[in-house]
A protein has these predicted regions:
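Conserved beta-strand in the GNAT
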Residues: 61, 67-76, 89, 94
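Conserved acetyl-CoA pyrophosphate-binding loop and the N-cap/start of the following alpha-helix
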Residues: 99, 103-111
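Conserved GNAT acetyl-CoA-binding A-motif
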Residues: 116-127
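Conserved active-site alpha-helix within GNAT-family acetyltransferase domains
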Residues: 106, 118, 130-148, 153
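Conserved N-terminal entry element of GNAT/NAT acetyltransferase domains
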Residues: 1-12
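Conserved GNAT-fold acetyl-CoA-binding loop/helix
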Residues: 22-47
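A short helix-loop-beta-strand connector motif used in the catalytic cores of GNAT acetyltransferases and
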Residues: 46-60, 89
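A conserved beta-turn-beta hairpin within the catalytic core of GNAT-like acetyltransferases
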Residues: 78-90, 100, 146-147
Length: 155
């Protein structure tokens, strides 16, 4: 396996992170007919740029050489009158298929978890499509458990 660096995304990584996000959308597309598969090309760059400048967000890149082979985007939310504890949300994560099962995703999640703990988060959330059984298993093996259920009805 090539050496893979997990780091806070740098300016030179942003196009690669955008491509990683687009790949995630393409893979998740079959799980939700309302998912706009063009969103990454239409809005992804602005979203990624905003994350990279947001002090309450973390944008990680998994990089080998000069190539982004995965990413993780997450946000921190302080305690509020509605939520008694601070929390973090893992918003987006992708690893190229050839590197799955080799620890890259685990390293991304571990880095995000450490960042969230340093900020004072007491809980982390992630959403995954129920039909994406591999993703659900991945997160469950890392201590995530169902908290609420979202049901959808097509009209």
């Amino acid at each position: 396996m090539p050496d893979i660096e997990i780091r806070r995304a740098e300016a030179g990584d942003l196009n690669g992170v955008a491509a990683s996000s687009a790949a995630l959308f393409a893979e998740d597309g079959p799980h939700d007919r309302l998912r706009n598969l063009q969103w990454p090309s239409e809005h992804g760059a602005a979203w990624i740029a905003g994350l990279s400048e947001d002090p309450d967000a973390l944008l990680l890149a998994a990089v080998t050489g000069n190539t982004v082979v995965g990413h993780l985007a997450g946000s921190y939310y302080p305690a509020s009158p509605m939520m008694a504890g601070a929390r973090a949300e893992l918003v987006s994560m992708y690893v190229v298929p050839g590197l799955r099962g080799k620890g890259v995703g685990s390293r991304l999640v571990a880095e995000f978890t450490a960042w969230a703990r340093e900020r004072g988060a007491t809980r982390m959330h992630v959403t995954a499509y129920t039909a994406n059984e591999a993703a659900v298993r991945f997160y469950q093996r890392r201590g995530y458990a169902p908290l609420w259920t979202v049901l959808a009805a097509d009209l």
